Structure formats: C-alpha cells, structure tokens
Amino acid sequence: MTITTQQLIALLPLLIVGLTVVVVMLSIAWRRNHFLNATLSVVGLNAALLSLWFVGQAGAMDVTPLMRVDGYAMLYTGLVLLASLATCTFAYPWLQGYNDNKEEFYLLVLIAALGGILLANANHLASLFLGIELISLPLFGLVGYAFRQKRSLEAAIKYTILSAAASSFLLFGMALVYAQSGSLSFVTLGKSLADNMLSEPLLLAGLGLMIVGLGFKLSLVPFHLWTPDVYQGAPAPVSTFLATASKIAIFGVVMRLFLYAPVGDSEAVRVVLGVLAFASILFGNLMALTQTNIKRLLGYSSISHLGYLLVALIALKSGDMSMETVGVYLAGYLFSSLGAFGVVSLMSSPYRGPDADSLYSYRGLFWHRPILSAVMTVMMLSLAGIPMTLGFIGKFYVLAVGVQSNLWWLTGAVVVGSAIGLYYYLRVAVSLYLNAPQQLNRDAPSNWAYSAGGVVVLISALLVLVLGVWPQPLITLVQLAKPLM
C-alpha cells in the first residue's frame, strides 16, 4: 500500500501528537525538567491544532479502512485537542508542589489525546475499540497520579477494574455483531443492517453488550457508579480530561456509528437508549442535589449532560438537526466544564494534599478573588442552561430536536432535569458571594490570571458568554463539520 502526501496531511494531528509523545519520552530519559516537558507537550498539542487547517484543505478521504478524515472528524479532533491542552496547562501549577515524578503526567495525557483523535476518525469497530483502550489505559495512571492519597488510589483501582469489565462487554458485543453481519466497518455494517437484519437475536444481543460497554465509558445510568468516586479521587486536572476529552471523543464515534449503521431504526434499541437517557437525566440531577463536594457534584452533573445528548442520538432520524445539536451541545459543555474544573484546579494548585473540592472552600470567594468568582458563576449558569450563555443554546437545540422527533417523554425529562439542575448550580454560585470564613483553608494564587491555566479559564468564560449571545460562528462551524457520506 502506497501512502500519498494527501493521506499524510490528513493524518497530521495524529502524527504530530505521536511525534510529541516520542520527543517527550526521550526528553524525560535524557533529563528530568518539568518546565521543558510541559512546554514540549503544549507546543505539540498547539501544532496539532494548527495542522487541522491543512487537513481541511486536503478534503474528506478514507485514509485507511479503519479511519475516515472529514469535517466531522476534524471538529471532534479539535475539541479533544483543546481539552488536552487545557489539562496540561491546569496540571503545570498543580504539579509544582508534587514531590514524585512530574513529567510522566504529560506523557499520559498525550497518549490519551492520541486515543481521542483515533476515536474522532474511527470508521471501523476495530479502530473504535483501539481508540477507547488508548484513551482509557493512560487514564488508569492519571486517576491514581496522587497515589499517596487514599482517595486517588481507590479511584484508580475502581476505574481500572470496572473499565476492564466494560471493555470485555464491548469486545464480546462486537464479536456477536461480526458473527451476524460479517463486517466490522461502519459503512458495510450499515448496508447489512439495512437488509432487515435488525430483528436477528444475535445482532440485538451484540448491540446490547456494546451499549453496556459504551454506557460505562459515557457514565450513563446504571453504568455510572464509578463516576462520582473517580471524579472526586482523581487530581483536578485529570477530572477535567475525564469530563471533557474522554466523553467527547467516545460520544463522537458513537454518533458516527449510529449515523452509518442505522441501529436506531430498531425499536428495541430506541427503547433501551430512551430508558438510559431518562434515567441518566433524572438520576444525575437528583443525586447532585445533595452533594457538598464540587467534583462529585460535577461528576453527577456530567451523567445528566450525557443523558441530554442521548436524546439527540435517539432523534438521529431527524438527520442534520440531530448532528448539529450534538456538535453545539458538546462545544458548550466543553468550555463550561473547562472553566469549572479550571477554577477547582487553580484553587488546588500547587499540590498539597487533597484538592480544594469542598463547597465550603468556595464560600465568600468573591470578596478576595472577584474575577475568579465571576468566571465560576458564568460556568455554573452555562451548565444550568441559563439564557445568554452557550449552555442555553445547546439545551435549546436538545429541546428542539426532541420536539421535532416527537420524543415527548424525553423532552419532559430534559425540562424537569434542567429545573432540578438549576438548584444545585445556583447553590454553588450563591455560596461564592456569602460571607467569607475567618480563616481560609484554600485559596487561588493572587497572580492566577497571569498563569497559563488562568488564561484558559478566562478565555473559556469569554467564549461561553460571546457564543451564548452570538452563536452563529459556532453553528456555522458545526454545520460545515457534517460527515460526508
């Protein structure tokens, strides 16, 4: 097989991040220098982001039977790279106080980013599985990075064992699908399913097992039990990656699979997904009500957000509107989550034991860190879906696509879930403006706005507000990024 220049250009983000992994690995072997390795990682991720412009010029193509590079792949690759970049910038000040090996953190983030890019381009069940494993394996190490803390170690063990079990379900499901359809490619699978094969018991069993495996990775109810514990135990920068890059990449590839292989045409699959969405929306929001730990609260909140996205997945028959909904919602979710977890990371830096994740740590923050409090307030309002924020645009799209597809019971769940969510998001926002305690147990550095992490948080807040008022640039970008069949 000869590789053309066009194909190499199409694979640029993957090649650049892969090269960065090798360079950082050699740099660590040569000399341990935290600043140098952090800089190399950030430069590599930025170069991969910039290379997307050249990929766009090359046009859509099937690079290998496993990978398709098109506008859709570029959008999700961009979102994964942005999340990875933010994770590295939040990690740098956090690692300053960390006494064990610092440099491997960036290596693991880069390898996980490789998995995310592979998922964004996946066009085959083999590349889907490889991508999921490539993003999951480094996360085992990242979640347990603060291994001297009991919670971090416990979270890593839970995540490793449950993730391995979920992967086995996913792989067994793929085997059953292959046994029935004779293909692993999304497109060929779609042709097989179009021939009235969706009623075959073996195929439905395979799809059911795949939904279990993917449901775990997306932390949908009832496969969500690991989520709050892992979000709480993992270091704040790692929780950022878990909540954003990991979820976005996996949901992106599931959306492509459902688009090419019309799995949603099966009434049984639609009912199962509908129940998962309904349970995730209501359970995620209800459990978040009682949380006093911000990372646990955001963990339960992410369960409900994936439930909202599942509504758009079930409504995929409505075509372009559904694709647009997922793109806009995930962009809003990315920037809102980066801002919220970014504030927690800044408050927890440098590392000195457990993160500043107690709600009490943020009480009265406005009186000594007003801009940081304003940023956190904007992020909470966006996650709640309040008008004039990007979160509202995403929520509006979900409701519109639900109504358009006559999914009334799920649309009702979205409305009720959003109303419940409003309470706990506002509870976090209000606590920022109460009287500050006499003695502060945790606080962000006074120069936080001049750090790379501070800049990322401020840009996220700005994007959430600007795109909330004027979302057209984002909508146009998402419309350009439709998969070319």
Curated annotation (Swiss-Prot):
Annotated GO CC locations: plasma membrane
What EC number(s) is this enzyme filed under?
Answer: 7.1.1.-
List the keywords (alphabetical): Cell inner membrane, Cell membrane, Membrane, NAD, Quinone, Translocase, Transmembrane, Transmembrane helix, Transport, Ubiquinone
Keyword field contains Cell membrane: yes
Instruction: Please report which protein family the annotation says this sequence is part of.
Output: Belongs to the complex I subunit 2 family.
* Lineage of the organism: Bacteria, Pseudomonadati, Pseudomonadota, Gammaproteobacteria, Enterobacterales
The name on file for this protein is NADH-quinone oxidoreductase subunit N
Catalytic class of the enzyme? translocase
Compartments annotated for it: namely: Cell inner membrane
